[in-house]
Regions:
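N-terminal intrinsically disordered, low-complexity tails of helicases
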Residues: 1-42, 89, 107-111, 117-118, ...
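Walker A/P-loop NTP-binding motif
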Residues: 29-41, 54-78, 100-105, 184-185
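Phosphate-binding Walker
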Residues: 26, 54-59, 91, 207
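Conserved nucleic-acid-binding Ia/Ib motif block in the N-terminal RecA-like helicase ATPase lobe
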Residues: 21, 70-150, 158-161
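The conserved Walker
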Residues: 47-51
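Residue-level signature of catalytic and energy-coupling elements of molecular machines
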Residues: 16, 28, 45, 61, ...
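Post-DEXD/H (motif II) to motif III coupling segment of the RecA-like Helicase ATP-binding lobe
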Residues: 154-221
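Pre-Walker A (Motif I) flank of P-loop NTPase domains
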Residues: 39-45, 80-84, 135, 192-193
Length: 221
């Protein structure tokens, strides 16, 4: 990853080295080049399970947050805001994504916080967690939508990045309606970068692509 020192914060690079992430996988390499280098493009990536899709979206979204917060005084009300929403199909995948994102944030944890809404906690605990405006929220679509409808998860003015991880599973598990509601009911900022990550590109995923993505880079790896 040292070849991407011009794109990634030194603290992120150090954490990658500590966690033995040496050479980027093809999907990570292509995503970094197209989402951070030059014009920040939307990404549609088809890559098999185990190909490194979490870091393929995780590194760009975390880098954008770190870069943004470096220019905001900690005393400002704009400093704490949810800037990335990661939608996943299951609690297990939420745990995996949260763990890997936190690994990358080893040296930035005083600056960037990740909240996992898929964990089975009381609603009062979840409300408190969201009231602190974590930088990244990882959730199933149903949990994210419920939190938005309750007014607890607010990203309309702050969202930089939207991710649907394992899109084919998100849709096959029946979350399609929740995803479309999140997209169409005014919960999101008008301008944000979107990552659709999937092991397969079936008709349902292609339909979601048309709804979500603007001039995307399509990676078939």
């Amino acid at each position: 990853f040292q070849a991407y020192a011009h794109l990634l914060d030194a603290r992120i690079l150090r954490a990658l080295a500590d966690n033995k992430f040496g050479t980027p996988t093809p999907v990570q390499r292509e995503s970094l080049q197209n989402s951070l280098g030059g014009a920040a493009r939307d990404i549609l990536a088809r890559a098999r399970t185990g190909s490194g899709k979490t870091l393929a979206y995780g590194l760009p979204i975390l880098q954008k947050i770190v870069a943004t917060k470096q220019g905001i005084p900690k005393s400002s009300t704009e400093y704490s805001a949810t800037r990335a929403l990661v939608l996943v199909p299951s609690r297990e995948l939420a745990e995996q994504a949260t763990r890997q994102l936190n690994d990358v944030l080893t040296y930035c944890k005083d600056m960037v916080r990740v909240a996992n809404l898929a964990r089975p906690v009381k609603s009062s605990v979840q409300k408190l967690l969201l009231s602190e405006r974590p930088d990244v929220v990882v959730a199933t679509p149903s949990r994210a939508l419920a939190s938005m409808q309750a007014g607890d998860l607010v990203v309309r003015d702050s969202l930089q990045s939207l991710v649907i991880d394992e899109t084919d599973l998100v849709l096959s598990y029946g979350y399609g309606t929740d995803v479309k509601t999140i997209l169409q009911e005014g919960f999101l900022s008008r301008s944000h970068q979107t990552f659709l990550m999937s092991a397969t590109l079936d008709d349902d995923t292609e339909a979601l692509r048309e709804l979500m993505l603007k001039d995307p880079v399509v990676l078939r790896l």
